[in-house]
């Protein structure tokens, strides 16, 4: 936090409007094209105001974090750090109103460390990598031979479903329903726990 303040405080004091712009934009914008809210909107005609999305996404994220905390405290074994990080980041991405392409990178390392099931992780990564080009192709519009929204929606739903599938595997792993290969390979300890092990 000291580094964050050291970098941000001078900029915020000298250029307060510019410094607040990201926060202003994020508060006022609607759902980004590759979120579940946009998929629902395109397919049902429902519209979501920025105020609703801000409130709903925050409440949903906090509720999911509380559920993850309860799960972590009550699981059959102490969860590994990577498992908890994956679940929290996945929860944020799935309920957030914005999903910029770089946000998916936040899941790569936790997914690789929490779930050594490479086929599932690579399947998600491949589908996720397709979302951006499909979005660009869709944004061309039908007059310019852009793809219909249904193809983009299938990619978005597939990406989200694979993220949820990985979360389910991780939860099953935490509850002792499936073998945790990482824990087994490290003498039943969490290699990321350090002094907290």
Predicted regions and their residues:
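Hydrophobic alpha-helical membrane-interfacial segments at the cytosolic entry of transmembrane helices
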Residues: 1-11
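Aromatic/glycine/proline-enriched transmembrane-helix motif characteristic
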Residues: 30, 34-94, 171-197
